[in-house]
Amino acid sequence: MAVKKACEMFPKSLIEDVHKWGCMKQTGVSLRYMMEFGSKPTERNLLISAQFLHKELPIRVARRAIELQTLPYGLSDKPAVLKVRDWYLESFRDMRAFPEIKDSGDEKDFTQMIKAVKVRHNNVVPMMALGVNQLKKGMNSGNLDEIHQFLDRFYLSRIGIRMLIGQHVELHNPNPPLHTVGYIHTKMSPMEVARNASEDARSICFREYGSAPEINIYGDPSFTFPYVPTHLHLMMYELVKNSLRAVQERFVDSDRVAPPIRIIVADGIEDVTIKVSDEGGGIARSGLPRIFTYLYSTARNPLEEDVDLGIADVPVTMAGYGYGLPISRLYARYFGGDLQIISMEGYGTDAYLHLSRLGDSQEPLP
């Protein structure tokens, strides 16, 4: 079997160690804790952070490696999934081989090692998409719920691993931008992020269609709160891109001017909520349950079937294989928020992105 062959690349002792660490308890971290702890990146704090990651990251990586070996319907045997599983095993091996962190020299070496781990895992999402696509061809849709639940757990865990590594690495930046603590912006303007994401999405729309609907943004431009701008940009880009495409395709042959996309930013006591509204014709009610799945996209997969699995630069993109909405919802949920879609077939769609303003939600730990 392919799984057995792949495992033979790694010593039996490593596989046993993976199972041992995969049974250990994970420790969740809140946005507020990351912000407060990282606000003083002293040598001592960086040492404490590295010591925590030295114990925590192998647990999280081991859990995913075990799950990648035991997927249903033969998904574990797909070449793309085997490649991802090998990345996780290699990263686990590197982390476990790293000695106890005792001083700042150890901490700096550890930071370089986990930076390399993060780079190794850059293409996990498109590679897993390729594996699922290889599996999907021979399955009926009734068997895909279990795969979907696995992918939710897997990608949520990946967001957490990359956040922990990225936050620690970024704390070493000798010249951090104003009001930033690692990846976190303590005074992030959701209006500004929404504007930047909208401009990026419109440029893609112009490239594909030659024109793009207007986007109007409403809210208090002076309002700020602590959040991770890269996460919000990713979510807003996906929502706006979907709305632009829907409106553009609905009005492409119409004499009417395409109506604008409307973005409203509301700052509540518990949540910051961003609504993205379009008049792109909406989604049929029968199709709504499928918009958050990874498995029913009608768009063309940008990854070619004959991709060389030895090459590390598979194109990193979410466009084309239907991962934008489910991944965006996971990013929202990672820090205690959510994403809801309400559609009116024949008119348009409203997307509600809820972001926890309190910042004290523990990471969800799948």
UniProtKB/Swiss-Prot annotation:
Autophosphorylated on Ser residues near N-terminus. Changing H121 to A/Q: Reduced autophosphorylation and slower kinase activity toward the mitochondrial pyruvate dehydrogenase complex (PDC). Serine protein kinase that inhibits the mitochondrial pyruvate dehydrogenase (PDH) complex (mtPDC) by phosphorylation of the E1 alpha subunit on Ser residues, thus contributing to the regulation of glucose metabolism. Residues 122-359 form the Histidine kinase domain. Changing H168Q: Reduced autophosphorylation and slower kinase activity toward the mitochondrial pyruvate dehydrogenase complex (PDC). It holds the Pfam family HATPase_c. The modification Phosphohistidine is found at H121. This is [Pyruvate dehydrogenase (acetyl-transferring)] kinase, mitochondrial. Disruption phenotype: Elevation of the mitochondrial pyruvate dehydrogenase (PDH) complex (mtPDC) activity. Altered vegetative growth with reduced accumulation of vegetative tissues, early flower development and shorter generation time. Increased seed oil content and seed weight at maturity. One of its GO terms (biological process) is protein autophosphorylation. It comes from Arabidopsis thaliana (Mouse-ear cress). Optimum pH is 7-7.5.
